[in-house]
Each structure stands twice: as C-alpha cells, then as structure tokens.
Amino acid sequence: LFFALTISVIFSCNIEKSIYNNNVVSSPHPYASEAGKLIFSVGGNAFDAAVASAFTLAVVEPSMSGIGGRLQAIYMTSDGDISGVDAMTQIPESYTKSEGEENDSYGYKTIGIPGVVAGLLKLHEDHGKLDLETVMKPAIYVAENGFEILPGEIKRIKGEVEYFNDFESTKKYFLNSNSEPLKPGDKLIQKDLANVLKQISKNGNAGFYEGEVAQKIVQDIQANRGYITLSDLKNYEAIESDIISGDFNGYKV
C-alpha cells in the first residue's frame, strides 16, 4: 500500500490522470502488478503497463525475471492481429568450442547476450503511449527505496546459495553478513540496479547496450574469461517473432 500511495503521489504531480475501466494486470508479484495498474491510471496503454510490470518484476523477482536474461512476447493488437517479439539470448561472436571439449555449464563462459531490455524497449517503442521515463518510474522507485523480499524468492536463493557466494555482487545484495540468504520480510535495496534502470529510462537501448553500463558488463565478463564484447552488446537487436498458429478443437491457437 505504501508503494502504491507513494508512486501515485509522484505521478499526480506530473501527469494528468485518466481512468481506464477495462484492464487487468497479472504478474507473479504484487508490486509488479501494481506498477502496471499505476501506468494504466495515468493514461498508459496495455503495452506501457506490461513493460512497467516487467521492469518492476526484474527488481522484485531477479532470480526469475532479471534484465540479464531473455524475452519472448506474444500479443494481439486492437485490430485482432497476432504478433510478437523475439529477444532471446544470443551466443557471443567470439565464442569458440574445441572439438571434444565439454560444454561449460556454469560461470562467465556460459553468459549469452541479454535480450530482455531490447525486447521490452521494442514493445514500448512500437506500441507504447507514454514516455519511457514515466513507464519505468515504478521499477526505479522500488529498486532505489527497497521492498520486503517474499518467501518464494528466498526459497530460490536458498536452493542456489553456494553459487551466490561465488560472486561479490550477489553476496552484497542477496546474502547477509554471515553469507546466509536474506529472510522473508527483509528489505532489499538495489542502488546499482536503480542506476542501470535510470540509464535505460533516459537513453533507451544505448543506456544498457552501450556506454558506461555496457563497459562495466564487458569488463566484468572479460576479467572472468567470458566472451561478451562491446560489439556483441551494441549489435544486439530484438526482432519480430514468426508466430506459429494452428487449429485445436475449433479454436485458433
């Protein structure tokens, strides 16, 4: 409730509100759903709300929905057309695998070029109504001010706690001073993520796939024998999906 009231105050100071009666927002986390609802309340359309919810979900459910992953979206436009966006992770151009060499299954060498940001921005650019900074306000607010972490996220962290201990950044944010997982109800503040989201909200794809954020991503990956380069990030592009459809029991699927 506090999150909703605070964000509503921020919006009310800057944007003329509109009332939308025919909309539903569903997500795995109440804050992500609330973000979509708030975007509807200030005149956004379904794409604005979906993008706002997805970016907020990256903050509150990072183990499942972080901005370092991939995205596939399918949607129906107001005229009934079915389309989608393909923003899958891609293999870095410099990746090589010697004959007989086993595939890496863990660590920096397994990191592909992330597509979530490009995919969400394509959805917004092609179909959104509000400006990107407005759409991303809820996600930035939650990352910067924190939220009470839910049991489901804690359970996933506990299941992989040995991996969280392998990296300074995951230890910093998701483990306590004793290298143990946070507990349900603990407050999680992610200032670094908030800064990245701000760069994206102001500069679009260039705020993530180029510039300071991209340089830090590549520096970390290259220092740990990964493959992603600045060129890989800059050249990444989300594309329109080829939609496969068919008939089933009298319905088009």
Question: What is the role of each PLM region?
Answer:
Residues 1-10:
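Bacterial N-terminal signal peptides
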Residues 14-34, 38, 42-203, 208-210, ...:
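Noncatalytic scaffold domains of N-terminal-nucleophile
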